Swiss-Prot record:
Family matches, as Pfam families: UreD (PF01774)
Keyword check for Cytoplasm: yes
Key words of the record: Chaperone, Cytoplasm, Nickel insertion
Annotated localization: Cytoplasm
Name of the protein in its database record: Urease accessory protein UreD
Species for this entry: Trichormus variabilis (strain ATCC 29413 / PCC 7937) (Anabaena variabilis)
Record GO terms (molecular function): nickel cation binding
UniProt superkingdom: Bacteria
Quaternary context: UreD, UreF and UreG form a complex that acts as a GTP-hydrolysis-dependent molecular chaperone, activating the urease apoprotein by helping to assemble the nickel containing metallocenter of UreC. The UreE protein probably delivers the nickel.
């Protein structure tokens, strides 16, 4: 089944954010936004060093033909945590592809914690997401992605549509991690062990920029009381966690435990769960 990958109508939301370190306080110094994307006023629940930001999609959901473009830049030594106000919803399409593109640049000594809430693909959604991160020497990135295929609470399964996810993380022209995922919506793929194995949720967490010890890898594997499948893979400059299962809270709890582990190890910071996750 062929899909139209060139949207000809719909929203084109844009969000450009620049963070800078000012006397050991991270400030959002540039903010350009175009509906339906918007960022709330920055706040500092753990002190001035780390700037917390919450992104909103004011239209409530994404339809075929929509385009969302993000450009995020952390200047040297800036520290930011960015999440979203709610789960993303990708609605059923009549043939047009919805697309999200995120470009992130992290300068020396800076760290971004990119922690969006889950994305829910309705049956029949046609969606592509691209994430590219450019790391300077001494920069760090922690990001996760949690995707639910079908509104499983209603018994819906992802039997129609298409999902593509392309992720690239680079440092000075050298690829640190390249990930390509494609899932066509059909019953065979949904139940195949090479697809979703009948499970509606997949998740990935990646930490890149600083090498981790074998002890950290072992701890990450042992964290979380999960019924779903999970795995941890060591990378040259970090590591990768994968999940496939049936519970959003299960995967997020595991990812949050891993995130906390890294915060303590590399920044001597305690967990600071975004309040918006509890609303």
């Amino acid at each position: 089944m062929a899909f139209n990958s060139q949207p000809i109508e719909g929203w084109h939301g844009k969000l450009d954010l620049v963070y800078a370190d000012r006397s050991n306080s991270t400030q959002l110094i540039y903010n350009h936004q175009q509906a339906p994307l918007k960022v709330q006023r920055p706040f500092y629940p753990e002190g001035e060093k780390v700037c917390h930001s919450v992104i909103l999609h004011t239209a409530g959901g994404v339809v075929g033909g929509d385009r969302l473009s993000y450009n995020l830049h952390l200047q040297p030594n800036a520290q930011a945590l960015i999440t979203t106000a709610a789960a993303g919803k990708i609605y059923r399409s009549e043939g047009l592809q919805a697309r999200q593109t995120i470009d992130i640049k992290i300068d020396a000594g800076a760290c971004l914690e990119w922690l969006p809430q889950e994305t829910i693909l309705f049956n029949g959604a046609i969606y592509r997401q691209d994430l590219r991160v450019e790391l300077a020497t001494g920069a760090n990135f922690l990001g996760w992605e949690i995707t639910r295929f079908g509104r499983s609470a209603r018994g819906e399964k992802f039997y129609q549509g298409e999902w593509r996810s392309h992720t690239e993380i680079w440092r000075q022209g050298v690829p640190l991690w390249i990930d390509r995922q494609w899932l066509p919506g059909n019953e065979a793929v949904f139940h195949s062990p090479h697809g979703l194995a009948g499970q509606p949720i997949v998740g990935s967490l990646v930490w890149l920029g600083s090498a981790v010890s074998t002890e950290i890898i072992a701890k990450a594997r042992n964290l979380g009381n999960t019924q779903g499948e999970k795995g941890v893979t060591s990378l040259e400059n970090g590591f990768l966690c994968r999940y496939r299962g049936a519970s959003t809270s299960e995967v997020r709890n595991w990812f949050t435990d891993v995130w906390q582990l890294l915060r303590v190890e590399f920044f001597s910071r305690s967990k600071c769960t975004p309040r918006v996750w509890q609303t």
